[in-house]
């Protein structure tokens, strides 16, 4: 008598639609689903996939990083595309003229880009201007910049681990012996 194959782990877990009920996001999904199907452009497929992502997987992009990435060679006069939010950076004084397309911009970022003579587009405007993603640079924020990633990895109390422990308090008596001082076993 044969053994039934266990089918409970067969499912490929990936999003086929956004979790959000935001009607404007869902309209963009409709548009980019059409473009991904009808054009042979990988740009539209990537944008569609990113529209499905959770907020933690769509980290914000600061203006300083945006400017740095757009200053790279052969990127002048191209549109920066961010499937997420662009945030202002007060440390940056002079902002070049940029053409930007993003899901959201903070009010500070929006005013500074426009003041520098730049242009801000929405994704439906981008679909008309560049239906195949021509002359665009697809950017995203640093996904691993969240504080929670410091706690991931090799266990905190093991040799050569740089993982941040979850501690109740940062006092003298908390997690200060083994692994923190050479006289107590080892020091990382």
Curated annotation (Swiss-Prot):
> Could you tell me what this protein is called?
Large ribosomal subunit protein eL18A
Question: What family is this protein classified in?
Answer: Belongs to the eukaryotic ribosomal protein eL18 family.
Function, as annotated: Component of the large ribosomal subunit. The ribosome is a large ribonucleoprotein complex responsible for the synthesis of proteins in the cell.
Q: What is known about its subunit structure?
A: Component of the large ribosomal subunit.
A single BP term in Gene Ontology: cytoplasmic translation
Q: What is the lineage of its organism?
A: Eukaryota, Metazoa, Chordata, Craniata, Vertebrata
Where in the cell?
Answer: Cytoplasm
Assigned GO CC terms:
cytosolic large ribosomal subunit
Regions of compositional bias (Basic residues) in chain numbering: 178-188
Pfam families registered for this protein in UniProt? Ribosomal_L18
Which residue stretches belong to region Disordered? 153-188
Is Mitochondrion given among the entry's keywords?
no
- Keyword line: Cytoplasm, Ribonucleoprotein, Ribosomal protein
Superkingdom in the source lineage: Eukaryota
Q: Which gene encodes it?
A: rpl18-a
């Amino acid at each position: 008598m044969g053994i039934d194959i266990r089918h409970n782990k067969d499912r490929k877990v990936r999003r086929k639609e956004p979790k959000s009920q935001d009607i404007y996001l869902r309209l963009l999904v409709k548009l980019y689903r059409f473009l991904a199907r009808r054009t042979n452009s990988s740009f539209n497929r990537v944008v569609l996939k990113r529209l499905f992502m959770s907020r933690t997987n769509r980290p914000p992009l600061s203006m300083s990083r945006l400017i740095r990435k757009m200053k790279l060679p052969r990127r002048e006069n191209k549109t920066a595309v961010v499937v997420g939010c662009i945030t202002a950076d007060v440390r940056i004084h002079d902002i070049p003229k940029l053409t930007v397309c993003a899901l959201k911009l903070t009010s500070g970022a929006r005013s500074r880009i426009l003041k520098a003579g730049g242009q801000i587009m929405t994704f439906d405007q981008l679909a008309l201007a560049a239906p195949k993603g021509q002359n665009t640079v697809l950017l995203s924020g640093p996904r691993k910049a969240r504080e929670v990633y410091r706690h991931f990895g090799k266990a905190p109390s093991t040799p050569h681990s740089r993982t941040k422990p979850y501690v109740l308090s940062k006092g003298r008596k908390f997690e200060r012996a083994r692994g923190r001082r050479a006289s107590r076993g080892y020091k990382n």
